[in-house]
Amino acid sequence: MIDKSKKTIRILFPQWQGGNQELYGFGARLLHWLSPESCSSLHTISVPEFNPDTPEPEEGLLYRRQLLSQHDEAWAVLEKEEPDHIVVFGGDCLVDQAPFAWMNTRHNGEMGVLWIDSHADVKTPRDFTNGHTMVLGNLLGGGDPEFASKVKTPVAPSRVMYAGLIEEGLTEQESSVISDLGLQIARPEELYENSDRITRWIKEQNICKLAVHLDLDVLNPDVFRSLLFAEPEPEFDWQAVYPVGKLNLAQTLRVIRDVSAETEIVIIGITEHLPWDAWNLKELLKKLPIMNE
């Protein structure tokens, strides 16, 4: 049942700079188009067109100034609207920083975070130049120092749980952060049949408000193709270097529905949607004879 006393907003955040990939913006817009109609207001964050000529990193981070500007624009929307619930259509994973940080401050640092992702997202600029690999680290007070300074109330480590994380793919730095902070992990294999590992954590931590980060790369690329790791004929073999997701759509939906029965979900951020087939068809259509008349 919809609680009409709650104010929900939608944020369309077609950010691509955090992953340096053009399809992130296209994927965000397609996500919004695919979503059910809603009376909620839509707020679109201004994002420049993709730059095919990758610049030098700025203090270790690609497109640092643009990413900070977009973060601040999203924060300004939240400050003005003061929503109870937020839906985010991304975009790379970094789009979730401003909404998660803002909502955690609103709830006095007591918000829980369910990070549904095959990757840890706790790197630093010393480890990588793409900002989307640092977003959870930023929210915890680590990651990139400048982005972390934007987080008024860091998320408490005990109130964070990974769902679907592939531990075999963790770097030494990522493993160290997870171990040092004591971050909880529900492995893919623990989620194939039920969500008990996560619902127990919600009860143990007495989490009344929960933000859900859904990185679509938690899905198995053999069953869901709109992912970085399902790129047709890739120039770079992503699957040979980075861990790929193991869940399917039904399992992922069941996890989210199960946790929503235990607590109030205040944010759902959906990220990393790379619809290769739709993009390639779009590129074909614009090159056909008489199509542009």
Regions found by a protein language model. Name each.
Residues 2-88, 95-109, 177-293:
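Catalytic cores of soluble, metal-dependent hydrolases
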Residues 123, 168-170, 276:
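Active-site environment of divalent metal-dependent phosphoester hydrolases
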Residues 124-127, 147-150, 171-178, 223-225:
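A short secondary-structure junction signal
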Residues 150-185:
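Hydrophobic, aromatic-enriched interface-forming segments
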